[in-house]
Amino acid sequence: MNENLQIAIVASLEAGKAIMQVCNTAFDVEYKDDKSPLTEADKRANDIINSYLIPTLIPIISEENKQIDYDVRKNWKTCWIVDPVDGTKEFIKRNGEFTVNIALVTDDKPILGVIYVPATKFLYFADVNLKKAYKTELDVHDTTIKEVLAK
């Protein structure tokens, strides 16, 4: 399996675990300049994902990172695109309808992606070059990449 896909899977699982830890507490909701909500779960998940993706030396576009000017980004051949908690409004409602989204894009086309649903522990991942996509249900967030691949 592609090493970057493995990194994205592990990052999404660890982020999902942190998201659920926050979900099970009383948490505050802040609002960003665009009036969209922001919670501790968004921040923790973003920090975790960044800790895995930064060492790849591939630029990251994340909803929760400081945005890089388009004049710089337009020259990136490859980048990560991340939404640490896609569905923050649903997270706030605690309805389970939120995901961790991580994609790797080259030449404006996705080459791999991970979607993790922490509330249900459903993991979706794909490698476009291999023309393969997977869905698996995990028992726990602390699943190793070896265990994911064995499912």
Language-model regions, residue ranges each:
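N-terminal subdomain of lithium-sensitive/metallo-dependent phosphomonoesterases centered on the IMPase/IPPase/PAP
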Residues: 1-85
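Short, flexible helix/strand-to-coil boundary loops that buttress conserved ligand/catalytic motifs
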Residues: 23, 127, 137
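Short, intrinsically disordered/low-complexity patches at protein termini
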Residues: 43-44, 114-116, 148
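Residue-level detector of flexible, active-site-proximal loop/helix-junction positions
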Residues: 67, 130, 140
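DPxDG-like acidic metal-binding loop motif
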Residues: 73-134
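Secondary-structure transition/turn motif
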Residues: 135-141
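Phosphate/pyrophosphate- and phosphate-bearing ligand-binding catalytic cores of soluble enzymes
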Residues: 141-151
